[in-house]
């Protein structure tokens, strides 16, 4: 037995009602009534968008019939990214991914406090309502949707809109990080006095 007390290391990001929870899903299509989740990723940031704490990223198993039924855009995009093969190889269910993400988020925010953050996040929320209702209910009803600032800058400050270039990787984790970077861009160039 050691005679020195263990050193308590503070978390990189303390639990706070001001933390942001960023989320992105990749889906088989846009209709939650017939399409399904393929991948989900979460990142938690402090209120200043730093530090970033990556949460779990899950490729969610779906049937071959569902994957084969995707339209050409989804087959091409998710085929090129390697996501289709990850989904086929995965054994993770939507319920298992949901539970693991809830356990991760509970370390950083209280239930019902954090807005859901991302790009066109309303679409992700629609899928969560259907396939991960406990996770959707963990969030506050408000959203921080970066696409709102994108649309406003396109109309009010086209040079700000044009100066942010997206990589368009269409993987959940890459898209989450890109959304955070895009909000930081608009914060610096659009939301200025």
Swiss-Prot record:
Positions annotated as active site in the UniProt record: 141
Secretion signal, residue range per the UniProt entry: none
InterPro entries: Exonuclease_RNaseT/DNA_pol3, Oligoribonuclease, RNaseH-like_sf, RNaseH_sf
Domain Exonuclease intervals: 20-183
Enzyme Commission (EC) number: 3.1.15.-
Gene3D superfamilies the UniProt entry points to: Ribonuclease H-like superfamily/Ribonuclease H (3.30.420.10)
Record carries keyword Metal-binding: no
Superkingdom of the organism of origin: Bacteria
Gene Ontology BP term (one): DNA metabolic process
Pfam families: RNase_T
Keywords from the UniProt entry: Cytoplasm, Exonuclease, Hydrolase, Nuclease
Family matches, as CDD domains: Orn
One cellular-component annotation, GO: cytoplasm
Compartments where located: Cytoplasm
Class of this enzyme: hydrolase
GO molecular function, one term: nucleic acid binding
Function: 3'-to-5' exoribonuclease specific for small oligoribonucleotides.
Family according to the record: Belongs to the oligoribonuclease family.
Annotated protein name in UniProt: Oligoribonuclease
Taxonomic lineage of the native organism: Bacteria, Pseudomonadati, Pseudomonadota, Betaproteobacteria, Burkholderiales
Gene: orn
């Amino acid at each position: 037995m050691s005679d020195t007390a263990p050193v308590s290391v503070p978390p990189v990001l303390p639990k706070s009602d001001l933390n942001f929870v960023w989320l992105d899903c990749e889906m088989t299509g846009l209709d939650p009534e017939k399409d399904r989740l393929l991948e989900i990723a979460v990142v938690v940031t402090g209120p200043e968008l730093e530090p970033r704490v990556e949460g779990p990223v899950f490729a969610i198993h779906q049937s071959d019939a569902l994957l084969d039924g995707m339209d050409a855009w989804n087959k091409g995009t998710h085929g090129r990214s390697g996501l289709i093969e990850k989904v086929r190889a995965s054994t993770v269910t939507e319920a298992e991914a949901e539970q693991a993400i809830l356990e991760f988020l509970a370390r950083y925010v209280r239930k019902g406090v954090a807005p859901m953050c991302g790009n066109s996040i309303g679409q992700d929320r629609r899928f969560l309502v259907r396939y991960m209702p406990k996770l959707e209910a963990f969030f506050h009803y408000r959203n921080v949707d970066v696409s709102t600032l994108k649309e406003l800058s396109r109309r009010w400050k086209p040079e700000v809109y044009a100066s942010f270039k997206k990589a368009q990787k269409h993987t959940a984790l890459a898209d989450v990080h890109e959304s955070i970077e895009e909000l930081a861009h608009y914060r610096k160039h659009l939301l200025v006095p």
